[in-house]
Amino acid sequence: IKGIDEATGGRRRWDVGFHFGDWLALDGEGDDGFKGATEDGYIATAYYYQSADIVAKAAKLLGREEDAASYRTLADEIKASLQAEYFTANGRLALTTQTAYAVALYMDFAPEGSKERIADFLKEKLKVNKGYLKTGFVGTCLLNKVLSDYGNNELAYKLLLNEDCPGWLYAVNMGATTIWER
């Protein structure tokens, strides 16, 4: 965490250096299409936030109050940076990918009062995509949890049990035992 802070000059956004993005997402275009359409800096900063949040909680459990307070402050500052950079004043997420919505909800950094709206945007995005996931390694593992958390169990099951490409069961039915690369 300290290395990220040093590399970014304390800006609380991890948008420098190479990032894998939402590796192998199906919504990417161009030469870097394999990284998906979700901005690398958004994903990296989200994980920077989550890491600081986890360390703050762990330090508190271990009785390291000074470390807990320091990392809580850092996590709160990163969260504020995410909100300032990627959310409108009305709480609308500027990035409109399935992954962006899922990450904001799962990692719980969306502004208060906007979470249900973001969950609705995710649900609508999946409908527009005819119930198919467009996520890569980052977003895929979060989708069903987030959908279920926000009362969309039916849609979560539809994603899980989809036997058409690019559904999870398509790969299983084709004999896959690991996640496929393109």
Model-identified regions with their sequence ranges:
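Active-site core of glycosidic bond-cleaving carbohydrate-active enzymes
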Residues: I1-R182
